[in-house]
């Protein structure tokens, strides 16, 4: 492999002083030189851009280096990221005042407030459906669009908190929304998704960017969402029939070679977007159908679809996105493909799917910003002093790229759905770039979080504006943060603490849902729980998850140090928060290290815990 890399500092600084300069174009890259030969080429300055107007006799120079290595492209990319652009140094700069765990609890409060989360219940065809306002652009909308995002996270948060505002008021109407979202007429579209959005003024479902139906939308809004609900409510026989309808529709649409069309026009039912190919993980819906319905025909079809996908997408490095407003330029669906292939490997044990998953994850690292090098230079953001690293784009992935993608004018996104998947990839490969990228995306992003709600902005250039027109994004944030933390817990405990993951969430990336069944904490079964007020920590670098074995009267407090230095925290427990209307008393507490070895701890109300850099400790709390 041969590469050419500009010296750090040649490209633009997206926020050099006190305003966004993200679109300033100072460096051009090409795989073709001026003679039309295949050769990595840099251009600086870019014609028509800054410093490109020069007089006779003027000179300008810039520094670059060639890299030649007897290895593939990925090895050279890693060298550039780690050795030239010093990616790993970023984690040493990071600081935080707001833990990811606290964000989960604050978003729980935000999401259960109908006013702040913009939740509405409406009657559609005699059925009460519930969803959140969506104030972005939607085809034919009159600012009346409604949407639900992460059904897995909705059911997960309801299960973990046992909050009646969710279990009794939200979930039944969200389920109705999902059932009514399925195209019911017995025709060419039967079983498919009628559209992501509900328009309450015209009382109909619609797609974001036009009157068409995509097969992958059936994978997303039917099979992923319904599959995740059924993990929590397997007794829902009617819902299984809806899953079968959706899966059979995908089967009908699949071509003999395992391929799908990108979309069909709703009126003519003819294929549309015929100039592009469905290089997306549409096959994953059939894998879900197999796992839910246990019918081998769905697994065989999923394998056929995946085989086509591996040959035509993964091996060629060609991918399509899922955002119609940018005509499907590559986006976070690439990361979903990695997780989908990994799950197919887990079911079939066919090594080619594991290798394809790893290959796809490697390709997705190129969707993560790794420049410019973060520093401690002080900058101004909306009148507030911020160090450069606080607002750095490094470690964040884009929503979509290409000439039409939001990466060009908005920068990357804070919705780090890929973080948990990258931790899993590190466990598989021991490739530290995956782990460092996961942590760079997740940790120390305070400058982008609305501290009143715990919700991070979606786009980088929104800084800490919060949810804005996208209140449903909080569900995705609950989902990806939980997936990331549980993936770190599994990694740091060497598999001693594991919780089964559910299915991928639609659209924004590969994060999984949890909590539908018990996990294991060093040999003991325990259910994940969230109880506001149960634990109080005084160190925001320490993240935690809690788990309960009610039969053995044991609470596990699983603690993570998410810093590159040793950290200490005082932990207080308010026992009355564990069970509503039921008093308990702590008998004894033991501290378990990352191997599960136990040491008794003094105290029954509060404890001081010290955890090594990126380490794990578990408090095993016995009560009566």
Model feature map: region roles:
Residues 1-241, 245-248, 553-555, 567-624:
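Carbohydrate-recognition beta-sandwich/jelly-roll modules
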Residues 47-49, 130-148, 201-223, 262-281, ...:
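Solvent-exposed loop and edge beta-strand segments that line ligand/cofactor-binding
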Residues 100-135, 165-189, 237-261, 296-320, ...:
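Long, well-ordered core segments of solenoidal/helical folds
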Residues 149-164, 220-238, 280-295, 336-350, ...:
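Well-ordered alpha-helical scaffold segments within catalytic/enzyme domains
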Residues 177-304, 310, 314-321, 330-333, ...:
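Extended amphipathic alpha-helical coiled-coil/heptad-repeat regions
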Residues 475-536:
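Catalytic cores of secreted or luminal carbohydrate-active enzymes
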């Amino acid at each position: 492999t041969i590469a050419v890399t500009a010296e750090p500092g040649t490209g633009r600084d997206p926020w050099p002083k006190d305003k966004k300069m993200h679109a300033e174009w100072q460096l051009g890259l090409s795989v073709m030189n001026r003679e039309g030969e295949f050769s990595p080429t840099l251009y600086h300055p870019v014609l028509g851009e800054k410093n490109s107007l020069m007089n006779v006799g003027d000179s300008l120079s810039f520094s670059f280096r060639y890299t030649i290595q007897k290895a593939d492209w990925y090895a050279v990319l890693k060298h550039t990221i780690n050795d030239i652009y010093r990616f790993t140094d970023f984690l040493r700069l990071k600081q935080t005042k707001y833990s990811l765990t606290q964000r989960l609890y604050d978003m729980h409060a935000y999401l259960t407030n109908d006013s702040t989360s913009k939740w509405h219940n409406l009657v559609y065809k005699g059925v009460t459906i519930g969803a959140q306002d969506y104030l972005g652009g939607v085809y034919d909308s009159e600012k009346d669009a409604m949407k639900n995002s992460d059904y897995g996270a909705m059911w997960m948060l309801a299960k973990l908190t046992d909050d009646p505002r969710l279990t009794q008021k939200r979930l039944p109407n969200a389920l109705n929304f999902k059932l009514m979202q399925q195209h019911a007429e017995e025709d060419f579209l039967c079983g498919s998704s009628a559209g992501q959005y509900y328009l309450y003024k015209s009382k109909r479902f619609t797609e974001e960017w036009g009157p068409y139906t995509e097969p992958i939308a059936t994978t997303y809004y039917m099979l992923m969402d319904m599959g995740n609900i059924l993990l929590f409510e397997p007794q829902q026989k009617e819902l299984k029939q809806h899953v079968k309808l959706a899966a059979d529709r995908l089967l009908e649409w699949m071509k003999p070679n395992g391929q799908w069309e990108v979309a069909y026009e709703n009126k003519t039912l003819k294929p549309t977007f015929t100039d592009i190919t469905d290089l997306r993980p549409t096959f994953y819906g059939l894998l879900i159908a197999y796992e839910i319905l246990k019918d081998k025909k769905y697994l065989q079809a999923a394998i056929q679809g995946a085989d086509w996908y591996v040959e035509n997408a993964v091996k060629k490095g060609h991918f399509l996105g899922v955002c119609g407003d940018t005509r499907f330029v590559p986006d976070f669906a690439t990361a979903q493909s990695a997780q989908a292939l990994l799950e197919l490997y887990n079911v079939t044990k066919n090594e080619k799917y594991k290798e394809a998953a790893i290959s796809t994850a490697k390709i997705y690292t190129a969707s993560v910003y790794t420049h410019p090098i973060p520093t401690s230079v002080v900058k101004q953001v909306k009148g507030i002093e911020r160090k450069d690293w606080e607002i750095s784009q490094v470690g964040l992935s884009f929503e979509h790229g290409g000439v039409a993608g939001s990466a060009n004018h908005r920068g990357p996104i804070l919705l780090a759905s890929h973080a948990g998947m990258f931790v899993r990839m590190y466990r598989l490969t021991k490739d530290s770039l995956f782990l460092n990228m996961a942590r760079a995306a997740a940790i120390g992003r305070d400058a982008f979080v609305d501290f009143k709600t715990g919700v991070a902005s979606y786009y980088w250039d929104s800084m800490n504006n919060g949810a804005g027109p996208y209140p449903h994004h909080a569900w995705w944030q609950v989902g990806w943060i939980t997936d990331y933390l549980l993936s770190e817990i599994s990694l740091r405990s060497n598999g001693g603490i594991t919780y089964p993951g559910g299915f991928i969430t639609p659209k924004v990336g590969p994060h999984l849902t949890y909590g539908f069944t018990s996990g294991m904490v060093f040999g003991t079964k325990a259910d994940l729980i969230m109880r506001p007020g149960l634990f109080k920590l005084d160190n925001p670098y320490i993240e935690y998850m809690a788990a309960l074995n009610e039969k053995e009267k044991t609470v596990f407090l699983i603690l993570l140090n998410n810093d590159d230095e040793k950290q200490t925290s005082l932990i207080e427990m308010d026992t009355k928060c564990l069970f509503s209307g039921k008093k308990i008393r702590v008998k004894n507490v033991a501290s378990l290290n990352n191997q599960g070895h136990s040491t008794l701890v003094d105290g029954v109300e509060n404890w001081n815990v010290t955890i090594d850099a990126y380490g794990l400790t578990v408090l095993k709390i016995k009560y009566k």
